[in-house]
Amino acid sequence: MRQRITYIQKPSLPFHPSQTTLTRDSLYVESLDAAREERVTFSFDELPSELWQVLRQCHQLHIRWASERAFEAVSPLSSRISPGLHVFYSPVEAGRAKRDSEGREPLCTLLKKVFDDELRCESPEKSFITPPILSKRFASTTAYQFYELLPSLGNLVTYIQQKFCGTDDKCHQRAASILSADSVDINYDSISHALTMSGFWSQAPGEQGWTETIGKHEGGTDKVEIGLLGAEPASEPEEIKVGGLLAVVGQDEELKPTLFSFPSRHHPLHEDATYSVTFPPPTGLHPTMTISIAPEALKEPPRRPDATCALHAYLTLPSKLFGDKYQLSTTDPLFLKSHNLASLRAVAGETDLEAPDWSISRWGSNWLLELASPSESDEVAEEWNITIPLHLRYLPPSESGYQPASVPWPVVFWACSAEDGTKMGVNPFDRINLGWEGLFGPRTMFYQLHPSPSPEGGNLVEELEVPVLTLKENSGIFNSQVIELGTFAVISIGFLWVLWKLGLVARSSGIRPQHQRNPGKRDKAE
């Protein structure tokens, strides 16, 4: 097992060498105000059998989870996804995966056991969607994609404690810390045969910063790498420069200074470059998502003169909600201008306009929209509003007459072309398989806007109330029994009316005797 812990400080935050103490077998950190990423890599023989039995059928498996809480993503860990659980999967062989001894599909069975037994996951063929491939050169795009809004990782913590920790109390504590993480990534590919799990905390759980002792593992065979880093101004627009201190616990006697730069796909914007999402009431069955972008976020990112940039939004819509791809893909300039949209770049998943939610087997749909932005000559003093017309599917009836629908916030970013020849190689902080970055070319750079929810709400998920059929008795004329009886009565009356009309037609068009012509007159005429 290999462990890497990285603390990332803002340049404005104070740091003193006395806050860290490195000994022969541990590193002590005291009151460190920083973001924290922990990454653990397991080899195949360190995994439980039920886990590697599923992984050996996977060519790629990438799991992403983000909290519903708003958090700050610092450079170089600035990439974002919509809140919830995202699964990206490619099988080793095309076709159906081998089922277990009880006839269950192995991947969905494992996902339910690890994350939540209520996941709407039956099999990749039935529950996953197939993402579009707009850039064939971007090899990271997987064959299947799954999503579900998952507020907590409590089941994952329990699974790790039972399958990996045993009676190790420190391991139990480290696993429990996942509950306060802002994002968690799990990666596996058939080339490396290694499972990597990483967690990101934008800040320490307490107000005093990080205070902890990181020791080397018993036996001394596992490697523990520590980094205390901070981003610095880079000389090139496509690069990120990082400097700080590094150490390997149990090998190094002191922290070693370091400074390095690398091309990066993901870059943060100024902290004032924010956006918020609302659904103006009343939402009804045709809600409109409004993305309000701060004026600071409308300025194009720093780029080379020959580069082009465009503002985008990537929507993750559960099956209850969908867009009309025919409406959003229009080239009508009046419609696009009225909503501040430029074009629909990509769509994948359920887009049936008439299907009710209970007939949908796949989880939902993804939408990549290019957004219109004001020209440089236009001065925008207030927020720039993007409106996206959406639609709700028919949902099962309820006693209250309403059903809840949770909608995660979209990811909003600038996508800019990099200089020809720029190699976006894998760097220590690179993050791919996010769903949306695979829809662009391999040398595209992304500049992330920061979600900024209202102080009253605080979450990156919007809650809608969907009007449905009322099951409750004595609730007026719109309860289920009245509608069922009324429907039966109308159909019966209509059927009887049709029979009555057919009877009248039959009576009025009875067979009449034909008059025989006089053959004599015919002969006389001849």
From Swiss-Prot:
GO biological process, one term: GPI anchor biosynthetic process
Main subcellular location: endoplasmic reticulum
Keywords assigned: Endoplasmic reticulum, Glycoprotein, GPI-anchor biosynthesis, Membrane, Transmembrane, Transmembrane helix
Location within or outside the cell: Endoplasmic reticulum membrane
Glycosylation sites: N385
Pathway assigned in UniProt: Glycolipid biosynthesis; glycosylphosphatidylinositol-anchor biosynthesis
A cellular component term, taken from the record's GO annotations: endoplasmic reticulum membrane
InterPro entries: Pbn1, PIG-X/PBN1
Topology feature Lumenal, residues: 1-484
Membrane topology recorded in Swiss-Prot or TrEMBL: Single-pass type III membrane protein
Record's signal peptide: none
Segments crossing the lipid bilayer: 485-505
Pfam families: PIG-X
Topology feature Cytoplasmic, residues: 506-526
Family per record: Belongs to the PIGX family.
Purpose: Required for proper folding and/or the stability of a subset of proteins in the endoplasmic reticulum. Component of glycosylphosphatidylinositol-mannosyltransferase 1 which transfers the first of the 4 mannoses in the GPI-anchor precursors during GPI-anchor biosynthesis. Probably acts by stabilizing the mannosyltransferase gpi14.
Protein name: Protein pbn1
Protein source organism: Emericella nidulans (strain FGSC A4 / ATCC 38163 / CBS 112.46 / NRRL 194 / M139)
